[in-house]
Amino acid sequence: MSNETIKLVIAGPRGRMGQEAVKLAERTPHFDLVGAIDHTYDQQKLSDVMPVESDAFIYTDIHACFTETQPDVLIDLTTPEIGKVHTKIALEHGVRPVVGTTGFSEADLKELTSLTEEKGIGAIIAPNFALGAILMMKFSKMAANYFEDVEIIELHHDQKLDAPSGTALKTAEMISEVRKEKQQGHPDEKEILPGARGAEQNGIRLHSVRLPGLIAHQEVMFGMDGQTLQIRHDSYNRASFMSGVKLSVEQVMKIDQLVYGLENIID
């Protein structure tokens, strides 16, 4: 598939991640950016409103965009609420969505799974597109077979809307698949300030840090008598996510089901 041209539409092209996705499309020979979806600048060229070379038109109407451009793949890098709507519409139009937003419920995923089966096309929803972050999650799941005590600290820029991050939640979920259930810490521990011990998922504590100067970082800390193990990943710029976006676009053309999490398409 990598030698065949893949027609792309990008939703949210002017956002920080969206700008990187436009650059990715421009420098990848077998990607053809045929349109973009935004809440403004309808029927203007991307090159007229952004420092890019693409002459693809911007659409404020997603249905019109899909009808006129006939894309193979939608790359959605918007918000959780908008991303949910775009994903469903894309599948209804026979367009394969690659989604980089979080916030999908079990009911949402079930509905989208039914749509992919009905249409016979693939969809990929990835809380994190950084390949290093995916490996961090895989390594953490491996370590959880031997270390029962674990806490997750995720650190992001101060404009991130959700906490804990989708990556932290996914990491906890993967660890829980192999970790023996255990209540960590002293059974009588008391929080002097509410929330001091962080959020909890399946007995795993999750801590969120939000500061300017950060991009996306996560540390998974394991401990047992006499030793600790720390697995950490850092994204220093948003270009770090593009290798995963590229892989997802290529892989979504080869599957006919919904995949949640990039770890499921990496051996």
Curated annotation (Swiss-Prot):
Question: Where on the tree of life does the source sit, at the highest rank?
Answer: Bacteria
Indicate which residues the UniProt annotation says bind (S)-2,3,4,5-tetrahydrodipicolinate: 157, 166-167
For whether the record's keyword set contains Transcription, the answer is no
What positions constitute the catalytic site? 156, 160
* GO MF annotation terms: 4-hydroxy-tetrahydrodipicolinate reductase; NAD binding; NADP binding; oxidoreductase activity, acting on CH or CH2 groups, NAD or NADP as acceptor
Assigned EC number: 1.17.1.8
User: What coarse category fits the chief subcellular location reported for this protein?
Assistant: cytoplasm
Q: Please give the biological process terms from Gene Ontology that the record holds.
A: diaminopimelate biosynthetic process; lysine biosynthetic process via diaminopimelate
Keyword NAD attributed:
yes
The residues the record assigns to binding NAD(+) are: 12-17, 100-102, 126-129
Compartments, record wording: Cytoplasm
Q: Which UniProt keywords apply?
A: Amino-acid biosynthesis, Cytoplasm, Diaminopimelate biosynthesis, Lysine biosynthesis, NAD, NADP, Oxidoreductase
Q: Which InterPro entries does this entry report, sorted A to Z?
A: DapB_C, DapB_N, DapB_N_CS, DHDPR_bac, NAD(P)-bd_dom_sf
Q: According to its UniProt record, which reaction does this protein catalyse?
A: (S)-2,3,4,5-tetrahydrodipicolinate + NAD(+) + H2O = (2S,4S)-4-hydroxy-2,3,4,5-tetrahydrodipicolinate + NADH + H(+); (S)-2,3,4,5-tetrahydrodipicolinate + NADP(+) + H2O = (2S,4S)-4-hydroxy-2,3,4,5-tetrahydrodipicolinate + NADPH + H(+)
Pathway entry:
Amino-acid biosynthesis; L-lysine biosynthesis via DAP pathway; (S)-tetrahydrodipicolinate from L-aspartate: step 4/4
What family classification does the UniProt entry report for this protein?
A: Belongs to the DapB family.
NCBIfam families associated with the record? dapB
Name of the molecule in the record: 4-hydroxy-tetrahydrodipicolinate reductase
